[in-house]
């Protein structure tokens, strides 16, 4: 876009702007010639702009037109909080965001009137992060509303909001929020740098932004947390993390993040610590079940039958007597079926989707057993895995475990128990090397240390919660950093 500065001649200035906006039917171009010789020209998109606001502003500007002078126009522009811009690029950005640009002959600037028409849905309950107890408000697609929701919940005098335009043409409104003195200065600097370096023009949602700014694009694990809950963002800010908001997205990004943080749920702190600790422990157990239960079944049936108790080995052998497929194919058949049912349930309307998932799973499982395509033991195994995968509170993390489960199954089918151990070592090594905005993603020493168990696998009473950062994998903040 043009970086040329405006001049005092209105036609020259319009020649810099109008060609860039092309011939749009919803682009309103109005010209007013006053009796005293002043010429006003204003541009806006009708569908994005409140035309009543534009009309009132123009009436205020041209009042008493017979005696109106440029000095009086400037004073009235100040009264209307019109923002002067000196280049065509900034003017076009403002028009595309729903504002009205006013050009006046004799002035070497365009003046931007804030007349955008906000179209957003009302506040609703979270759909992907439901809790039994806690706030029932979720973010919406309007960035200003989301900023207000966060500030309303985060009553801190040092809460800082920085707005920024991102994308190849710097047209997408975004913002970062952090609490000065709690967030690490290096993390804030890195967030700003990565946002400014984005060269993609089409950013429709924070999910696109997440992929553009994460540390390792080839890792199966999410390195940025996303949430639709204002209370979750507020808690993260108090713990020294940085929030990233994008206009038109109801999900806020939080950095840095760790494996422990991704396994936490907001209602962990709204319930009694004993029950919350038990549920959190079950979540970590569900990781093992999701990743390795199918693999263990394949290993024991294919290679290590001797590790099973005799009665169980006989039962499994009897169940598989008429199954014509090897264990790996049998397991893949059921796992793929479950994934298809899960995907179908997500895409269909809620009542119908739930019915498809429940009825489809029961009917297909029963039919597969009766047709001797799979064993009944495997149906139980796959059902337990499906339930375990739903306990992961972060949807993106759950997807990662589901993908890795298939790799684990192939490892078990090829190398047996050694394949599972090798796969575990590879995942462990990857996690310990992974970072999130320079902070460790998984630190075994800190994660399993008794000193830090107050907010990792278990949650002790809130009075024992550290004042600075409530997760052992989360970076500590020096008091001297801002």
UniProtKB/Swiss-Prot annotation:
Its main location: membrane. InterPro entries: Spore_Ger, UPF0353/GerABKA_families. The keyword Mitochondrion does not apply. GO terms for biological process: spore germination. Pfam families: GerA (PF03323). It is found in: Cell membrane. Forms a complex at the inner spore membrane which acts as a receptor for L-alanine, thus is involved in the stimulation of germination in response to alanine. Can stimulate germination in the absence of GerD and GerK gene products (fructose and glucose receptors, respectively), but the response is improved in their presence. Belongs to the GerABKA family. This is Spore germination protein A1.
């Amino acid at each position: 876009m043009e970086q040329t500065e405006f001049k005092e001649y209105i036609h020259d200035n319009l020649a810099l702007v109008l060609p860039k906006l092309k011939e749009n039917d919803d682009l309103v171009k109005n010209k007013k010639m006053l009796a005293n010789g002043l010429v006003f020209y204003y541009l806006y998109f009708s569908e994005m702009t409140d035309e009543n606001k534009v009309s009132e502003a123009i009436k205020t500007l041209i009042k008493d037109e017979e005696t109106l002078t440029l000095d009086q126009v400037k004073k009235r522009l100040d009264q209307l909080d019109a923002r002067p811009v000196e280049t065509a690029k900034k003017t076009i950005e403002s028009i595309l965001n729903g504002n009205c640009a006013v050009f006046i002959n004799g002035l070497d600037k365009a003046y931007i009137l804030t007349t955008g028409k906000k179209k957003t849905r009302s506040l609703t309950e979270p759909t992907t992060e439901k809790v039994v107890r806690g706030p029932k408000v979720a973010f919406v697609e309007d960035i200003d509303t989301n900023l207000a929701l966060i500030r309303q919940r985060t009553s801190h005098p040092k809460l800082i909001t920085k707005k920024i335009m991102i994308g190849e043409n710097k047209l997408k409104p975004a913002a970062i929020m952090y609490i000065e003195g709690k967030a690490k200065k290096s993390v804030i600097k890195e967030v700003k740098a990565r946002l400014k370096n984005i060269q993609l023009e089409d950013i429709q949602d924070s999910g696109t932004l997440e992929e553009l700014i994460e540390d390792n694009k080839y890792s199966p694990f999410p390195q940025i947390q996303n949430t639709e809950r204002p209370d979750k963002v507020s808690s993260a800010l108090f713990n020294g993390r940085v929030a990233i908001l994008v206009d038109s997205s109801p999900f806020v990004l939080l950095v840095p993040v760790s494996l422990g943080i991704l396994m936490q749920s907001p209602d962990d702190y709204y319930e009694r610590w004993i029950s919350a600790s038990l549920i959190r422990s079950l979540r970590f157990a569900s990781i093992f079940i999701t990743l390795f239960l199918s693999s263990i079944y394949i290993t024991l049936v294919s290679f290590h039958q001797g590790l099973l108790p005799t009665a169980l080995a006989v039962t499994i052998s009897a169940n598989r007597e008429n199954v014509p497929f090897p264990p790996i194919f049998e397991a893949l058949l059921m796992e793929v079926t479950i994934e298809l049912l899960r995907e179908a349930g997500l895409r269909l309307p809620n009542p119908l989707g739930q019915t498809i998932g429940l009825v489809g799973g029961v009917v297909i499982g029963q039919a597969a057993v009766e047709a001797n395509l799979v064993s009944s033991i495997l149906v139980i195994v796959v059902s337990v895995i499906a339930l375990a995968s739903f306990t992961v509170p972060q949807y993106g993390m759950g997807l990662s475990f589901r993908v890795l489960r298939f790799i684990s199954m192939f490892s078990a089918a090829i190398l047996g128990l050694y394949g599972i151990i090798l796969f575990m070592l590879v995942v462990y090594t990857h996690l310990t090397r992974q970072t999130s905005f320079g902070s460790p993603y998984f630190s075994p020493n800190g994660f399993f240390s008794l000193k830090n168990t107050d907010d990792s696998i278990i949650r002790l009473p809130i009075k024992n919660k550290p004042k600075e950062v409530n997760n052992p994998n989360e970076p500590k903040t020096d008091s001297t950093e801002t």
